[in-house]
Amino acid sequence: MDSKDRQILALLERNARLSYGEIGKAVGLAGSSVHDRVRKLEKRGIVKGYRAEIDFTAAGLPITAIVSLALRPASPADIPAKVAEFELVESCYSVAGDNSYALVVRAPTTKALEELLDALRAKLEVVTRSTVVLSTPFQHRPMLRG
């Protein structure tokens, strides 16, 4: 990966809807060259997909919580697969420290969050620790510099 690839990645990270021509103008390449480079980045697994940025409050999921899971001896071995069955869980991270997993949860109400926590504890034999997000000063901050 060279500096042009890094510049292309930085632009895509900020706005994945840019055309190849627009990216090309910004990095000094023809649109067709940008297209070729992006396809190679996709094939190498560096660019894994393109996503819409969703306003979860407007979409009916105004409650965001970080839920930590501490395993017990009776906890199943395939926690991530089991967690994926819960539709309110957006992300699951395997973490080091006192807990084994951290989940990002989006819920329509605090009651729905409470029901999810009860279900996680019952079905996964885990201890949960929850933090409800009050506000999000920033998220999805571009990390690549081009």
Predicted regions and their residues:
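A compositional/biophysical signature of low hydrophobicity enriched in polar/charged and small residues
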Residues: M1-G146
